[in-house]
Structures are given as structure tokens and as C-alpha cells.
Amino acid sequence: MLSINRKVRVLVVDDSAVARTFLTRGLSSYPNIEVVGYAVNALDARGKISSLAPDVMTLDVEMPGTNGIDFLKELLPVTPLPVILVSSLNLKVFDALAAGAVDFVRKPDGTESKQSFLDSLAQKIVVASCAKVRRRAAVSPAAPSLSSVSPAGVGGRSDLDRTIIGLGASTGGTEATLEVLKRLPADIPGMVIVQHMPVGFTKMYAERLNRLCRMEVREAVNGDEIRRGLALIAPADLQARVVRMGSRYTLSCLPGEKVSGHRPSVDALFSSMASAVKCPMVGIIMTGMGLDGADGLLQMRRAGAYTIGQDKDSCVVYGMPMVAYDIGAVAVQASCENIAGVLMAHLKGDK
């Protein structure tokens, strides 16, 4: 777990007495976490936030009265408090992330131990205590036009048909990745995306991106061909690696050991690209705690890839991009909102 020199003050918000007791007792067992109180609904939470001054709040998405999403929309513009969602397998979690929540965990459903759930939540709470809360505007389903792109596409067909883009993100990355993808055209070179996310959510995340972006986006399956106009989301709990198959490239999505503490791992993806890809490639590393992806991005740059890192000011957590920049893996830094423009300029050969 990330080490900090103080206890993180946590407010637990859940309408279920059983859930509140479980979370309060469970989180209190961690030496770097102090549960300072609990609230049973949004109205109760507003008062507790004012009186208890928590560093982080855990929030149930589904609550009677004002639900978690509406509560965040009201709260965060005036009180930018890091929030971790505690949610069942539900699309509403992405609406809450769009409203400004930092991260989320899936409620225990019998597929993982309660201790594993608490360990994951505690880790995310500590990370969230270091996060920068960014209030995000609602995303329009219509992607902004790119006036520099001709109807024929973003440039010469041959190079762009063969180009592969890898993107990795963690905490804060679900909305940051959307910010990038919604600014890209439908015929973007083939993309592979690793976003650290609990099991069950990557398919829903891919479906959401597919609705909001111009290119096709879907959760990858083992053996998928990487092709122009398609963005593949690496499935949770599988390692995703690019494999060369003659003149084609496919994505391997298989069980395996964690790499850099994660499965899927950005390092595993980027390292595979550095060793397997013999055509133009781009690596993008975005917001997230830790160092996953930094070494792999360095390997990509040494193999001739163009590499982009999200800048500090626009990151929810400036961890992975910072490490990548510090070791020389990043060719150019850009804000979340400008990464797409930097990428497009590179693909078109603009200087």
C-alpha cells in the first residue's frame, strides 16, 4: 500500500446499517486510515463533511432520496472532496465518475473475499487522499469536429493503416481516456487501452465509450485483430499483449501473473509493443498512482515510438506519467484536453 505519514480521515456514506458497520470496522483496522464518522444519506453527509472535515469519502451510488450521482453534482463544485464509490455492477458508476468521483470499488458479491475487497478499498482511499478532484462537464455524444481532418482520413492510408497506439491509465483514467477518445476521428489507427478496473466493469466501460466516441470501441477478446478505426479495452484480470502475426497484429488476452502490481498491466502492454511491433507506434501514459507503464513506455521510445505523457496540472494523480517523464520515457507532455491534438499532429506529420 502507498505509504503516507499521516492517517487518512474517512467519512463512510451508506444507507445500509450492515454496510456501514462492515466498512467502518474493516477500514478502521488499517493503521493509516481513521474512520471519523458515517452518514446515512446525502443530507446527513453534507453536515458531517462540514463538521468532521474528512480527507476522503466513500459513497454508495444507490441511496434513497438524493442518489449518489446527484449528490456529487451538488457537492463537488463547492467542496472538492475526493470520493471513492462503493458500487454493485452498475452502469451508474460511470455517471458518478463523470460527476467527479475519483475511483470506485465493486461491492463484494461472493467472487472475492471481504478482506480482498477491504484491501482494495483501503488502497484506493490512500491514493484518493493525494488526488486532485476535477469537476467534469457532461460529455456530449457528438464528438467535436476536427477541421484539419479531410473526409479521406487523417493522412496517408499506408502508414496509418499499420500504426498502433497504446494507452494506459489508472486512477482518474476513465474520464481522462474519454476526454482523449472523443476528440479523435472514426478512422484513427488501431488502439489498445489498459485501464485499471475491477472485474465486470471493462465491458460496460467499452460500451459507454463506444456510444460517446466516433471510433468503434469494445472490450477485447483473445486474438482480436488490431485494426484502424477500432479501440480495444483490455479485459479486467487478464494480461493484454500485442502479438505479431505475419503482417497483422493481434491482441493476446490471457491469464497471467501481475506485472508492476497489475493485471492487466500497462507495462505488459507497452513492453509487448516495443518487442513485437515493427510498424509506426505511439504510447500514451495518463493519470494514475504508481509506476505501471513507465518502464514499458521507455522501451517503446527506445524502439522508435512516439510517446506522450499527461501533464501534472490535468492529472487526478500525477504518478505514472511523472515516473515515465522522470526516466526519459516521455517525448512530449500535454494536458488531458490537448493529448488528442498532439497525437493528431504527429499522425499527420505536422512539425
Language model features by range: what are they?
Residues 1-11, 16-28, 32, 38, ...:
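Conserved acid/base catalytic micro-environments in cytosolic active-site loops
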